[in-house]
């Protein structure tokens, strides 16, 4: 077995090596616009960011059929539920099967997190998600069409993960069969998944009375508290209007009523 090298093979011929060239067709399909809070205590950023297939792979760690199927499912849901609007990662709750692949897609695209109670688990979903917009309580479900993914590959995926004493596959067999299974997965992706559109085999429906599982843990998420705070009307910050604009000057704004208020501390006299 090879070991990772100290030199990162970041790209090959200008492309990320970790996304095979034959997945090029998936790139334009699996693009997601998302929006987030502007800072840890900030309001909602009005500009969006684009999440690509490469981003999902970097977050998850590798390309696999589960990652791609989850991304196809989420693309189908977004097209129906949000109708061109971005995924607002400050305002979504997601339910996913307890799968590394599906769960990572869910977390990255919706902002759902187990520790805040906004990523919850339901293994009965299979390859699919339930997504709730918290502010409106509108809820949608997306599921993969039954039989779309080959049952033989599913059987082998489960068998190759069985490390119990009674496992049907020996360690010597695994050395070969893991590679066979990977080849079958990729062949299915290339021949079937990439030849389809997300809405072809991933069905989305609105849920009027969704049963959302209990959270694993539920702490307060602080970076979305001020998402609806209005933009300042008096204080002119050097970091407005664009955080990514020119490099601003450093130091306080002299003579500013609001700089003075800040310097007095939270419990100091208020303005006006």
Task: Describe each region flagged by the PLM.
Residues 2-63, 68-272:
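Non-transmembrane, aqueous-exposed alpha-helical and coiled segments at domain scale
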């Amino acid at each position: 077995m090879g070991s990772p090298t100290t030199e990162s093979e970041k790209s090959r011929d200008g492309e990320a090596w970790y996304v095979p060239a034959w997945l090029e067709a998936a790139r334009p399909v699996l693009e997601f616009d998302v929006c987030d809070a502007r800072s840890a205590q900030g309001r909602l950023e009005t500009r969006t960011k684009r999440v690509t297939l490469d981003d999902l792979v970097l977050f998850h760690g590798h390309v696999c059929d589960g990652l791609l199927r989850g991304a196809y499912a989420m693309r189908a849901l977004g097209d129906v539920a949000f109708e061109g609007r971005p995924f607002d990662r400050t305002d979504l709750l997601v339910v996913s099967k307890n799968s590394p692949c599906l769960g990572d897609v869910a977390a990255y695209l919706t902002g759902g997190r187990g520790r805040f109670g906004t990523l919850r688990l339901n293994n009965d979903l299979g390859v699919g998600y339930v997504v709730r917009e918290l502010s409106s309580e509108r809820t949608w479900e997306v599921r993969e069409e039954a039989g779309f993914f080959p049952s033989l590959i599913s059987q082998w995926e489960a068998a190759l993960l069985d490390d119990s004493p009674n496992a049907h596959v020996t360690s010597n067999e695994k050395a070969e069969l893991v590679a066979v299974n990977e080849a079958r997965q990729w062949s299915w992706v290339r021949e079937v998944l990439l030849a389809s559109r997300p809405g072809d085999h991933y069905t989305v429906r609105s849920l009027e009375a969704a049963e959302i599982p209990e959270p694993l843990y539920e702490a307060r998420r602080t970076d979305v508290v001020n998402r609806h705070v209005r933009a300042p009307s008096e204080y002119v910050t050097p970091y407005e209007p664009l955080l990514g604009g020119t490099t601003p000057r450093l130091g306080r704004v002299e003579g500013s009523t609001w700089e003075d208020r800040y310097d007095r501390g939270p419990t100091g006299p208020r303005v006006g």
